């Protein structure tokens, strides 16, 4: 008989349930969607495999899907991001969760294989590790999947590559590309939670520090804005000339990483690319420089190069490692170069995940409702869904907006 769940400590379930209830109070849109079905079960009998950070907000999504009738299995999307108390609460509630904080790479792969082995109808992913597994080692299972969703920029990039090669086995809805996701989750959520992670890991004063932000996409914009708001001097590095120009006109210093390396007190990567901070950059950094990554995978900082160029390494705080270089300089790495906001903090605030996970829930309903009719490609979230989520969010915030008059609607349709 298949194992029902695996978590670190089931006795943490009470604490986890309180965390989930706190998130529910701050996720009114998703809770309204949950209750809108009444006693209907639109996902009755549908098996959902989810690869998501196991947080209190994820729990609200998972329990919404289950209330709608789905059979949900959950694996983490990062070995270090699971909130053990939340995992315990979900297990106690009967969810098939296979996650604990501090998994080895082998345990992480086992968890993904375990949820994939439940032969899901729908796949929810954050980073596309589960999608890729279903397209490679477990392809026979992937061929039976109705469709999936993807939460992150990194994951969408991987899935579009599969689509370009003609290898995508099932339709995927790019939840990341919803306006009510990336404009808020990526910018406000990551911006705030990255600062939170750096502060929890180091407890340094931000005011007066030089913070180098690599990447000025929506994530980088949010990080740069929040650090500037706390009094930091922010330097942005970019490879995209349009984004670099935007950063410059937003008032930030823009330069190359080679130039910024000797300037920064804190370095944050947010590019989705590999070795953005490489050995040659670390060789130029000042004593005491702090390195953190806000991108999905731990590839943006060349940790292997840092290990190789160091003469010693020690854990100086819970999520902070000190690397001593041959000349005596010390560099500090937060969370092994993994997602700083989820390793050293609690991830995005519930209020922004409310919109992201509402989009996820609606995408799952769409896949189930249009089974067999969606093309095998990466789909964008429809504008009508974005507007619905935005309107619901505004309502829960007590914000009212205008509507076009009939005269205004007619005016916008004329050409002279």
UniProtKB/Swiss-Prot annotation:
Annotated Pfam families: AdoHcyase (PF05221), AdoHcyase_NAD (PF00670)
Record's catalysed reaction(s): S-adenosyl-L-homocysteine + H2O = L-homocysteine + adenosine
Primary subcellular site in the record, as a coarse category: cytoplasm
Residue positions binding NAD(+): 152-154, 186, 215-220, 238, 273, 294-296, 341
EC number(s) stated in the UniProt entry for this protein: 3.13.2.1
Compartment list: Cytoplasm
InterPro entries: Adenosylhomocyst_ase-like_sf, Adenosylhomocysteinase-like, Ado_hCys_hydrolase_NAD-bd, NAD(P)-bd_dom_sf, S-Ado-L-homoCys_hydrolase_CS
EC main group: hydrolase
GO molecular function, one term: adenosylhomocysteinase activity
Function: May play a key role in the regulation of the intracellular concentration of adenosylhomocysteine.
Stated name of the protein: Adenosylhomocysteinase
Phylogenetic placement of the source organism: Archaea, Thermoproteota, Thermoprotei, Desulfurococcales, Desulfurococcaceae
